[in-house]
């Protein structure tokens, strides 16, 4: 064997040993693989479509968010889009709860029927972004008058055209906050927080969507367009401020990495790769492209699974530069969640009769140490037009299912 071949063999062995060691070092990989999936928010074209107790139904469901409360109950939120799948018009903020704090959403029958957080008038309510704070659940959401839309010119059911969102009080996008202190059973009337938590003169706005976090030091952090919203003070009685982030995206995720720092992982502007910045409540560094996380300019979701060894941060998005149907869940073992080297495609656990899975997502850690994920799916009846129905899938899987993926 020549010296070059010998050196090459050493490199190959070293790389193989490192990869093998990384897998072996996580004891979760030795457990039996588990996954389960089913449609949770059923669109109007599906058998037994979801409707409110009033009988009101929805063409489509989009923009999911999920959290586990202090009791262990799971709350799943979504936008109920009345007439089509688009971002404008009559959209209600709806949700489901698990029937008990202990069933973890194992089966479709474990959930209560569809309820409404808010849907006042023909307005556009959405971008659910909950955060659990002791016995209080804060739910941030966005709202605009139904006569307006982001770019204007959209046709409403009565034939009128929407106006373009502008910086006037009536025409701008508003930030609202509602709370629950009974495990999501009831919600307070939403309070408009726009004047204190949205930059002056900003017309369009988006909070989350997804979820906020509670830091190890006690503060709450909620991602929003161009900023973080910070909750200080005692649990359930927070005072709120905003932290402006230069270069932040229109839709952001937030997590506290195992090293105690904060990481924003944002939707990129053009299609390509995720935009990431790290920092603290005192300030963030610049956003930079993460070339290891391809993204088709869509929302993603992130979850701090645990901070003790082996520390794990979970990330989910469509791992493609140009399509939303390449959904993948990944694990990072880095203290700063720098690299997500292990992952698995969701299509490895296919689900029939739900359309084409992919798009927005949200994750939570369930009481039985599984990962619960809500993922959008598009029926694509008119090739992505406004008539294509959208539903939302609920997935449960364990760490072993990710770790033992065929591409690891």
Swiss-Prot record:
GO molecular-function term, one example from the UniProt record: exo-alpha-sialidase activity
Residues that carry a glycan: 237, 398
Residues given in the record as substrate binding sites: 62, 81, 87, 150, 267, 324-325, 333-334, 339, 360, 378-380
Pfam families from the UniProt entry: BNR_3
InterPro entries linked: Sialidase (IPR011040), Sialidase_fam (IPR026856), Sialidase_sf (IPR036278)
Superkingdom classification of source: Eukaryota
Enzyme superclass (EC): hydrolase
GO biological process, one term: oligosaccharide catabolic process
Cleaved signal peptide residues: 1-22
EC number(s) per entry: 3.2.1.18
Role description: Sialidase is able to release sialic acid from a wide variety of natural substrates.
Family of the protein in this entry: Belongs to the glycosyl hydrolase 33 family.
Name recorded for this polypeptide: Exo-alpha-sialidase ARB_03431
